[in-house]
Curated annotation (Swiss-Prot):
Gene3D superfamilies: 3.10.170.20, Leishmanolysin , domain 2, Leishmanolysin domain 3. This is Leishmanolysin-like peptidase. Belongs to the peptidase M8 family. The gene is Lmln. InterPro entries: Peptidase_M8. Keywords: Cell cycle, Cell division, Cytoplasm, Hydrolase, Lipid droplet, Metal-binding, Metalloprotease, Mitosis, Protease, Zinc. The lineage of its organism: Eukaryota, Metazoa, Chordata, Craniata, Vertebrata.
Length: 681
């Protein structure tokens, strides 16, 4: 995968896949939406914008399968321990700047690997891992009843896993056939000890490769060797592009998510491995040729999987002008994935989980469909708040190589319980149905981005967001033209409008964003990150970012008052505020003042004093159940909660009189003191 900070739009080129203006200048601040590349002539865009993930499967000459592991006893499904990943850092990691090296070795990879080791168990090989050597000519022979492969000619000087050179102490003895003839045998040093107490060896590098310079990516990863008994990957690599490693605290969560995503590709979620999956009894789900391998698809450059793993299906797809077209999708149809997908969407007839069908080679088929699982960790771009859901854990179980600990799955709100119409039809059908009922078409949206911005909340209510519906420079493909009408848009222009993230089938949705100043990243709109707290003089809505903060809708724009001065921020609609749960219900905190939400949709009049200003505004209560495990029945708010005691206005007549009296006394005090001193003497 080629992952990046937050992105998901198409790459360069004509038509909808080309670059477009995705930036808004807001009083000197560049607002960049994740997944919106900047148009020509726009201000520079930081790594917050990137192309989709492109997981490049290594070619069949770069991947070595059927690697013999000594005493590799395999049991059926009953794994006996957590997955053990051994991390080997390349010299290029040691050459990073100290703060980047510390981030990679002490935070990013240890935390990612700790999570994955707790999440998965494996059919553990009892022996050590010794990897096969690559051949100088990429040609080799195998002998019947001999588990090793023999290079025709010579072994390669170096064996690589992706761009990283594998240490000699991890490699089997070189075995060759001179001039391609028998007898063949081992040459050179004997087998070293290899890697003990590991199920998977991960080689981590920070090499400035060609991919790093051309694809604007943070990192990429893949597997490079598979063991002989069950075809499970036993070695892989992850390469971090050195110039893209960020040490900013606000970007750590995104980078950690990227590293997890990369390692999961190397462990099993890869189109290059679909043909090697096994059932729960250890039998291959795809038939094997005489050489013990699945058939190879030369047009795809992959081993061809069977329809027990991936199946092609046609959907009836609503588009504009009341037309229905046929939309081809590929579904992953292994048993646990089907079970978890049906439960998640509440669709008992769902045939499987849809794989990505856009983004080009490396994105297609290697990820979940972005339209259906927007912020799931294994979708093809990082737009916001990645979570590793039960569906991905189910896929890893269905490889036949792992058992998943589902208590480690993270909650995925996107698409949850929305039914078959959501998961099997186009987003146009969903949006139109909700428009007819005068309902918000969540998780999609149909509000055009404008200046000033109309802010809303991300679907999980953890970040401020905007609808990413926009105009493209060219008409979208007819299959992705969804709108029969948009306020203020002429009918002839409607084919140009869609969501900014191509791999979400151009479906528009509310998306978090980040602020940039002179091209430099300032902060994101994620409510939970303390470093996103706005400066006091820019905090119009009296917002509070931090671990206990959520996004709340604003009924009206907040106004800052100081004597005769009044200021308001043109971009409004939502903000970040702390909430807490109580026996009385959900409490919203604005600075140190709490407001009780008695029911969803209740208007909270806010008037607080902060930094010498009075902040006036109205917030809308969410449902208590959105954030609390126990909630009282909803009631109308008491009168006392509707009209709260207002803070003292320091510029009112009464307060001005008090101030004037104190000033008068202050001026009179020296005169009075002087008079008393004179009398005393």
């Amino acid at each position: 995968m080629a992952a990046a900070g937050s992105g998901g739009a198409g790459g360069p080129g004509p038509g909808p896949r080309g670059r477009w203006g995705g930036c808004l200048w807001v009083r000197g601040v560049l607002l960049v939406l994740g997944g919106l590349p900047a148009g020509a002539g726009a201000a520079p865009v930081s790594l917050g914008t990137s192309p989709p993930c492109r997981h490049h499967v290594l070619s069949d000459t770069e991947v070595i399968n059927k690697v013999h592991l000594k005493t590799n006893h395999v049991t059926k499904r009953d794994a006996d321990g957590h997955l053990r990943i051994k991390t080997i850092y390349d010299q290029s990691i040691e050459e990073l700047l100290p703060e980047k090296r510390y981030l990679v070795k002490n935070k990013l990879f240890p935390q990612a690997i700790s999570y994955l080791e707790k999440t998965f168990q494996v059919r553990r090989p009892a022996g050590r891992i010794l990897l096969s050597r690559q051949c100088a000519t990429n040609q080799y022979l195998r002998k019947e009843n001999d588990p090793h492969r023999y290079c025709t000619g010579e072994c390669a000087v170096h064996t690589k896993c992706g761009p990283v050179i594998v240490p000699e102490e991890h490699l089997q003895q070189c075995r060759v056939c001179r001039e391609g003839k028998w007898p063949c045998g081992a040459v050179g040093v004997l087998d070293p000890e290899g890697v003990r107490d590991a199920d998977f060896v991960l080689y981590v590098g920070a090499l400035a490769t060609e991919r790093c310079s051309h694809e604007n990516i943070i990192s990429y990863a893949a597997y490079c060797q598979q063991e002989a008994k069950m075809d499970r990957p036993i070695a892989g690599y992850a390469n971090l592009c050195p110039n893209m490693i960020s040490t900013q605290p606000q970007e750590f969560i995104g980078m950690l998510s990227t590293v997890k995503h990369e390692i999961i590709h190397a462990l099993g979620f890869s189109a290059g491995l679909f043909a090697f999956y096994h059932d729960q009894d250890g039998n291959p789900l795809t038939s094997r040729s005489a050489d013990g391998l699945p058939p190879f698809n030369y047009s795809l450059g992959l081993y061809q999987w069977s329809d027990k793993v991936v199946r092609k299906v046609e959907r009836l797809w609503n588009v504009r002008d009341n037309k229905i077209v046929r939309h081809t999708v590929y579904l992953l149809v292994t048993p646990r994935v089907v079970e978890e997908a049906r439960k998640h969407f509440n669709c008992p007839v769902l045939e499987g989980m849809e794989l990505e069908n856009q983004g080009g080679m490396g994105t297609e088929l290697n990820h979940w469909e972005k339209r259906l699982l927007e912020n799931e960790a294994m979708t093809g771009s990082h737009t916001q708040n990645r979570v590793l859901s039960r569906i991905t854990l189910a896929l890893m179980e269905d490889t036949g190589w792992y058992k998943a600990n589902y208590s480690m799955a993270e909650k995925l709100d996107w698409g949850r319980g929305l039914g078959c119409e959501f998961v099997r039809k186009s987003c146009k059908f969903w949006i139109d149905q909700h428009r007819q009922r005068r309902q918000v078409p969540s998780p999609y949206c149909d509000t055009l981005r404008s200046n000033p911005l109309q802010l809303t909340c991300r679907q999980d209510q953890r970040a401020v967001a905007v609808c990413n519906l926009q105009r493209f420079p060219n008409p979208l493909p007819p299959e992705y033209q969804y709108f029969d009408e948009l306020t203020g848009i002429p009918a002839e222009d409607l084919p140009y409008y869609g969501g900014s993230v191509e791999i979400a089938d151009y479906c528009p949705f509310s998306q978090e964003f980040s602020w940039h100043l002179s091209g430099e990243y300032q902060r994101s709109s994620d409510c939970r990150i303390l470093e996103n707290q706005p400066e006091l003089f820019k905090n119009y809505g009296a917002e509070q970012y931090g671990p206990h903060s959520v996004c709340l809708l604003q009924k009206s724009a907040f106004i800052m008052e100081q004597c005769e001065r009044k200021l308001s921020y043109p971009d409004w609609g939502s903000g970040c505020y702390q909430v807490s749960c109580s026996p009385q219900g959900l409490k919203v905190w604005v600075q140190d003042t709490s407001y009780l939400c008695s029911r969803a949709g209740q208007v909270l009049p806010v008037r607080i004093q902060m930094n010498g200003w009075i902040h006036n505004g109205n917030l809308l209560c969410p449902s208590c159940w959105d954030f609390c495990e126990q909630c009282p029945p909803e009631t109308d708010p008491p009168a006392a909660n509707l009209t709260r005691a207002l803070p003292l206005d320091l510029c009112s007549c009464s307060s001005s009189l008090v101030v004037t009296l104190w000033l008068l006394l202050g001026n009179l005090f020296p005169l009075l003191a002087g008079f008393l001193l004179c009398v005393w003497h």
